[in-house]
Amino acid sequence: MSNENPNKIKTTSNIKLKSYYGKNNPGEYPFTSGIYPRMYQDKLWTMRQYAGFSSAKKSNERYHYLLRQGVSGLSIAFDLPTQTGYDSDHEISDGEVGKVGVPISTIEDMRTLLDNIPLDQVSISMTINSTAIVLLSFLIVLAQENKIPLDKLKGTIQNDILKEYIARGTYIYPPKPSMKLVTDIFEYCSQNMKNWNTISISGYHIREAGATAVEELAFTFSNAIAYTKAAIEKFAQ
């Protein structure tokens, strides 16, 4: 290991790195330098693999396997019918059930999916948008059934509906009511699930849909600004 003084480390551009930067230190409001005092030096990133198999049972088996291998969190991939609000037995779901992720139509499916997984110990990420409020509700019910306080749940729900209009197309409702659902999640979690990340704003899908790097950044930040404004309006009411 190097004996170099960490306070004298420089970047490849010969810029000296500090432990902390300016008056807005990491872990302090407004958190522009990070949400933890020492960031990854004390708290490593959550290690998780995006996964969702053709059934809740098979997906559950995979999650237990991943946890045995040492992942520190789970990342749930849902199939297209689940993403767009269709039950697996709906005629429009024919041919798509379980293709790109796990099908979840009912609370019973969710019970099977997360069977014997300690929800108060394992961070869970759910990549879901237009039906985010439904899947989050399922998770809340499971926690309540297992007598787990909601403020003990840790994880993230993508809840990034605007990029669905721009890139993926898995929206259900017009933008205005969809944004209300987004901010309803903000409101509920801020009051009941303090350790839950209520949105994950994504640019990757926009780039994959044909945007340039500049357009990807522009759309992503404009979405973030729109969510921020919607949240301010919500909490000002």
Region roles according to the model:
Residues 1-237:
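Catalytic alpha/beta active-site cores
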